[in-house]
Structure formats: C-alpha cells, structure tokens
C-alpha cells in the first residue's frame, strides 16, 4: 500500500493525488473526450462512462494507480460485458445505493422483503439502461435525430 504512504504534500484538501503524471493522464482523457468521445456520446455500457471513470480514478488515486484502474475498466468495456453501475473504488456509491450500518433495519420487525437484518446495502432499481441505447433513445438521438426523417 505504497500510495497511502505518500506525503501530505502530494494530496490536496479533498484527498486527491496531484502531480505531473496525474495531470498528464487527465489531460489525455480530456483530449479524448473533446475529440473522439463527443462523436460517440451515450454509447458507453457503464455508468459513469469510461472517460469519467478514468478522470475520477486519476484524481482520486493518482497517475499510477488511477491509470491502472482506468486501463482495467477499458479492458472490461467490451461487447460481452453487461455494463451497469461501476464506481471508482474509494468514492461515494452514488444515489443508486442506499447504505445502512450492518445490523440496522428500518423497523424492529426486520426488513419487509425477507432479507436478513445483516445485509449492509439495499440496491435501488437503476435508472440507466444496460448496454448501448437504441437509436431512438439516449443522448446520441438528441444530437443527430432519430434517423427517420422529418415525417416522424
């Protein structure tokens, strides 16, 4: 766990690692987003998108570990992957996950859905789609239209 032994000078107030390598990787991801990713808006299988994941990983864990996390995510982003919500390790779980302390329940009788009281988290139904959006849905359709012409 070498990254935890970094001096305090290498981290900012939010706990993000700063340095030339993380700046370089973040700049490369921003160039990718400005050039290529803008053409393929809304086609990522994961939430957050792979480029947003890479930026968050580099900000949170620095250039080396964040770069490794970003490359591992890119290797997971392939046609056979189911996709879904995949946050950067060490970040907040987001609005789709409700966390409770282990052993705590909503009422003294236990959860109504039959789970045991020791379950640490309850997954809220996701609001995003799995896989790429259909041509008539999503951000890309808003940018380029439905492809059906002005009749529809």
From Swiss-Prot:
A matching Pfam family: YidD
Region (Disordered): 81-152
Lineage top rank: taxon: Bacteria
Membrane protein topology class: Peripheral membrane protein
Keywords of the record: Cell membrane, Membrane
Listed GO CC annotations: plasma membrane
Major subcellular site: membrane
Location of the protein in the cell: Cell membrane
Family of this protein: Belongs to the UPF0161 family.
NCBIfam families referenced in this protein's UniProt entry, alphabetically: membrane protein insertion efficiency factor YidD
Known role: Could be involved in insertion of integral membrane proteins into the membrane.
Protein name, per record: Putative membrane protein insertion efficiency factor
Organism taxonomic ancestry: Bacteria, Bacillati, Actinomycetota, Actinomycetes, Frankiales
